[in-house]
């Protein structure tokens, strides 16, 4: 559904403009409603169409609040989840708390990840790509069974 990397600018109010190519599907699938939250592993944000988020929220509600790790995941994802609505101009307001977490300033990158977007600061995105390409991790040993079967 969502793919590609697009450089965008945040305006003075912390809004970004969703690219035109995604607006119709977001209007159709989730009535322009989205949920933005933090990524658990990297300094970026995750932006979900509302219907996608509802299925994730269901999975999160099935986790046990008695298990410390599961409770931490719930706290981080749900505690930072912010509902955003795309306006008629395609703008989406990112809360100050989320912008601060992802170190967003003027230049941001919107990265399509099939069912969601990642939102990165420009410099953090460039560093992440560099790190991913130059990673010295033994590739074959770290591949999951799903990745071993993926042919590109």
Swiss-Prot record:
Q: Where does it localize?
A: Cytoplasm, Nucleoid
Domain of life per record: Bacteria
UniProtKB keywords: Cytoplasm, DNA-binding, Repeat, Repressor, Transcription, Transcription regulation
| Keyword field contains Transcription | yes
Domain SpoVT-AbrB intervals? 5-52, 81-124
Record carries keyword Flavoprotein: no
InterPro entries for this protein: MraZ, MraZ_C, MraZ_dom, MraZ_N, MraZ_sf, SpoVT-AbrB_dom, SpoVT-AbrB_sf
| Any Pfam family the entry gives | MraZ
Q: Give the transmembrane ranges.
A: none
Tell me the SUPFAM superfamilies matching this sequence: AbrB/MazE/MraZ-like
Kindly list the GO CC terms recorded for this protein: cytoplasm; nucleoid
One biological process term in Gene Ontology: negative regulation of DNA-templated transcription initiation
Q: What GO molecular functions are on record for this protein?
A: DNA-binding transcription factor activity; transcription cis-regulatory region binding
- Which family does the record claim for this protein? Belongs to the MraZ family.
This protein's assembly is summarised as: Forms oligomers.
PANTHER family (UniProt xref): TRANSCRIPTIONAL REGULATOR MRAZ
Q: What does this protein do?
A: Negatively regulates its own expression and that of the subsequent genes in the proximal part of the division and cell wall (dcw) gene cluster. Acts by binding directly to DNA. May also regulate the expression of genes outside the dcw cluster.
Q: What is this protein called?
A: Transcriptional regulator MraZ
